[in-house]
Amino acid sequence: MCCKRDAMLQLVQEEALVLRSPRDFRVPVLSVARYLEIRALRLELEGLGAFEAAQRIDDATLADLERLLQANEDAIARHDLAAALQCNQAFHLGLAQAAGMPTLKRFVDHLWMQTAPLIAAGYASFSPDMRVGHHHAIIDALRQRDGPAARHAIEQDILDGGTQMLAYVMRQERMHAGATQKEMDEEEHEAQD
């Protein structure tokens, strides 16, 4: 039990969980402002990581990223979203690792820890192309050792997914502020008209 509690406390320290009482650990609800801050940091850090990775990547690491992309596509095809999510996260973190910048990798890990539950909640609603479409462009840029193209592709990946994530976070924030499901559905319907 001690090891589990230590692991849970580490997740609290990483801001992936919130400790409400000694026995009550919860996934934090991100505010819109907090989500936008994390997304802005991911854009900068993962963009820099992709740029640097394109300059430094070796054939073995590139092959690993290609395998992760294929595994992600396979998981999506068999509707295994848990596996697809793991592959998606591993791809992003592997790209950060390929940059050869350990501090950057730690920051990216920390940001992913904070947003993993949110990404999991929204991933099911993404189209297959949205889930991995930009990953193909990243691989192409890495093969060509094209740092600016790699940066652009990872930024587009984060932004495209971020649109749906932002809508989800806004909805969650309104729910916690007391809006009813019916009110939110009506607002969403009016916005679509």
List the model feature ranges, each with a label.
Residues 3-4, 14, 60-62, 126:
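Intrinsically disordered, low-complexity segments enriched in polar/charged residues with Gly/Pro
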Residues 54-55, 100, 123-125:
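Short helix-capping/hinge motifs at transmembrane helix termini and TM-loop junctions
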Residues 22, 45, 67, 130-133:
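Alpha-helix N-cap/N′ positions at the starts of helices
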Residues 1-55, 163-193:
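Short linear motifs at protein or domain termini
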Residues 42-43, 51, 61-62, 86, ...:
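Short, intrinsically disordered/low-complexity patches at protein termini
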Residues 33-34, 38, 59-120, 133-140, ...:
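Conserved amphipathic alpha-helical segments that form helical-bundle/coiled-coil interaction surfaces
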Residues 124-193:
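C-terminal regulatory/effector modules of DNA-binding transcriptional regulators
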